[in-house]
């Protein structure tokens, strides 16, 4: 099974816990929080009630063990944030899934909305999320077990790029976004106004490639999606899948460096 969480900006916490619970043993820790003082906050564990519709029976109960334990891969990229990082982190820490793609966004903060009398509200950061192995993803993100870059993605934006962002409380290396070489070259060529006609055709080609790449998300095509192909190859090879479980824990986070043009320098 493949969970495609690329460009998933997140959602409700209970939804993330529910998705995680569908793949983890009952009672397994999914996520916890800590405040500024470092004291433990809430801790949420995997329970059937988290994914069962009210009044319905457990759809996973009674399934053969071989079905419950099928290989799972999770696809992530720099657009995977918040709740999608909670799911990725939980399945990664429990070695239930192999994470494939590129480093996630790094949005590990908990916000509380405080309504005001005039109808507006203030969103206040009150704590940070931690994975089952007590990792903070804040400004660092989830490191994939198997890194596969997306050749069609020319720019990566992450939490660490935001001015005034909260740093990683565990001292983890912050991971910034990156402008890939081809994007920089295209910008420089445009500024210099060189080979206008050729550049125009190249721009159309890139637009076509981007449209095809977006379309492949809705109509999955491994031939055009290297990350999806890597995920498929893993689930088709159980031995390789098992070897890849937890690989990210054995390597440090990679810090992407922004490329700059000569004018920027």
Where are these regions (language model features)?
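C-terminal "post-core" interaction segments
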Residues: 1-265
